[in-house]
């Protein structure tokens, strides 16, 4: 890669609230040799842009358009195709969220750039990403301009460096033809009414089959309540129906990066550990 080549981080937010995974992705960009620009797309996103301006970044670039009020893959691709053409970043970083996974492949194809997904680290001229459910880690080398997504928890949100002064905020000259957006916006997907986004939790109490009996789960729930933590579990607990599947952490569940992770009765199998490797030691 070219020394000092621009990295463009694509922010993710919903209902005026910034997804913490964005801060993690900014932290990843800050370790990669920058300078970093942060792009905020949506409608009425001045508050989100101002929040991100606190980061140690070259600038925050805003694409504000009524067509982006509700998320659609087409809208994001149309806007980012123009923005990337104008800004010419060598690398585009995104959090590896459901939303980014929805539109990033189409964006990469549209602008003819390689896409490296689910990265856990920036390394030399490339990236590190897990393979075979986290049993191996591969070094991925990429030549030329490209896109990369970062696994939630691979970098810490609180590791993002703040600037001495707010970064400048600039409106980008991007025009979106709403007629080209084929999707109809719908409510964000949730697996169940009780679904919880554990990736945003700062404290988690997680239980495994080592707790032996379902009645012991109540003690863990009381501990979580006393700590102001979310309750979670390894797969055997959820498979047994002791907790709903949206509480599962691991390769087939959620990936988390809390400040405190308390594991009770969990053996530490790799399938579980890949879901909580970002937890603070």
Question: Where are the predicted features?
Answer:
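N-terminal glycine-rich FAD/FM-binding segment characteristic of electron-transfer flavoproteins
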Residues: 1-281
